[in-house]
Regions:
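Short alpha-helices
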Residues: 112-182
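Hydrophobic helix-and-loop "lid/oligomerization" segment in the mid-to-C-terminal part
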Residues: 2-23, 29-58, 76-77, 165-259
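Hydrophobic/aromatic residues located in beta-strands of well-ordered beta-sheets
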Residues: 47-49, 107, 157
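Short glycine/serine/threonine/alanine-rich loop segments
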Residues: 45, 105, 146
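Active-site cofactor/cluster-binding pocket
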Residues: 63-65, 69-123
Length: 259
């Protein structure tokens, strides 16, 4: 793995960048590419943004379609940056059969997942202890370019942190302390928390409410025995849907996940 200083040197000495988010892109990956990309643009870099498939309608309030493309141009960029993933298979629509383009290129990976089949010619910085790639980016960029993190960038990074943590429900222990410290720092930089809460967690389409009604009608409660405690059981409530029902109700996977 490379040091933060080595990653910074690559980003600062080069001029043209292609930033990639993984297929079926989630909030953390989408806002990681937009956040880092904006910081590079502030340094007069030329940045292009790519992901294999259109992001969810949940994220449409960002007007991402003005920047993020779903077809890759295979131009000779100085650096390809993979954010929130670490193998070609996560952007297979771009990489399958095109390894002769990707392999020789200088690449950077910034990620919070455990390593998979990482490509050659790649500088890598990862921390699996981080709850999101956006929180990892904040840690790096607040050291590298603190004066460039404005309200727009802070909002992107806060959105990635918020969505990957389940709106701060998934973190525990020391990680929880760190997550809230980062969130507080981003709010001090004028991250637009209300926009995030309203647009992602509160606003619902009529179709998504109908879909939620379907899930509630299928809700079941069962007793579940914990594998590590033979005599201890918990009540588990679950529901389910089929992919064909997403089409029927005209909702996508992220709309279903965010309820």
């Amino acid at each position: 793995m490379n040091t933060p200083a080595e990653i910074r040197e690559i980003l600062e000495k080069n001029q043209t960048f292609a930033l990639f988010g993984h297929e079926y892109i989630d909030g953390d990956a989408l806002w990681a590419i937009l956040g880092l990309g904006r910081l590079l643009e502030k340094q007069w870099k030329t940045v292009s943004y790519f992901t294999p498939y259109e992001p969810s309608r949940v994220f449409s309030f960002l007007n991402w379609e003005k920047k993020v493309k779903t077809e890759f141009d295979y131009w000779k960029y100085d650096v390809l940056v993979f954010l929130d993933f670490n193998s070609y298979k996560r952007i297979s629509a771009f990489t399958n059969g095109r390894e002769e383009y990707f392999d020789p290129m200088q690449k950077v990976i910034i990620d919070h997942h455990k390593p998979e089949l990482e490509p050659v010619n790649t500088a890598i910085y990862r921390d699996p202890e981080e709850i999101s790639t956006c929180s990892l980016l904040y840690d790096l960029c607040s050291q590298w370019w603190p004066d460039l993190i404005d309200s727009e960038v802070a909002t992107y990074l806060y959105m990635g942190l918020s969505t990957d943590s389940g709106n701060f429900r998934y973190d525990e222990g020391e990680q929880s302390v760190r997550v809230f410290q980062i969130a507080a720092n981003l709010l001090k930089l004028w991250a637009q928390k209300k926009v995030i809460i309203d647009e992602i967690f509160r606003n619902k389409t009529y179709r998504s409410v109908q879909f939620m009604q379907l899930l509630l009608s299928r809700m079941q409660k069962v007793k579940f025995q914990l594998p590590f405690a033979e005599k201890e059981t918990i009540n588990l409530i679950y529901s389910f849907y089929e992919d064909t029902e997403l089409e029927q109700y005209a909702v996508d996977h992220d709309e279903a996940d965010y309820g």
